[in-house]
Amino acid sequence: MRAATQVLGCRRVALIDVDAHRADGSENIFAGDASVLLLDSFQATAFPYGVAPATAANVTNMPLDDGTLGREALARMEAEWLPRLYDFAPDLIVLSIGFDTHYEDTQTLLKFSEFDYAYLTRLVMRAAHDLCSDRLVSIMEGGYNKKALARSVLAHVGTLVQ
């Protein structure tokens, strides 16, 4: 994020983090930084445990209950995050996507599918097109089920290159 503002000249950067684990490190770094918007979804019962409220106005946490379906999470993201993202009007969007939310991943308890990852990717790509001339960085975080991870990465990257 700092490189985007310092090197690329971006005034505002949005970080969208979809993962089974809370982006507490990112939140600790960027809380209170008006040049960064952090939108974070995570499994409420995954480490680090707890559903503490966001620590600053530029942070939106979306804890997800165990068993939350991808389509349910995506509906919430569209309703709660998109207005915030469009109001923020970033110069760059960073999508940090963890495939440990997949329903076949036995280490976590969320129920996303590869179709959900493709939908999320399209949603963020559309926002990047509308807001920041398609400036989008994708960071893939991983997952624990190798077969589900492979299909999920393929769905995500395949959508990015369409």
Identify the residue ranges that each predicted region occupies.
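Conserved alpha-helical scaffold segments that buttress catalytic/binding sites
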Residues: 1-130, 157-158
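Short active-site-adjacent structural elements
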Residues: 102-107, 135, 145-149
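Short, electropositive alpha-helical surface patch
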Residues: 113-114, 146-162
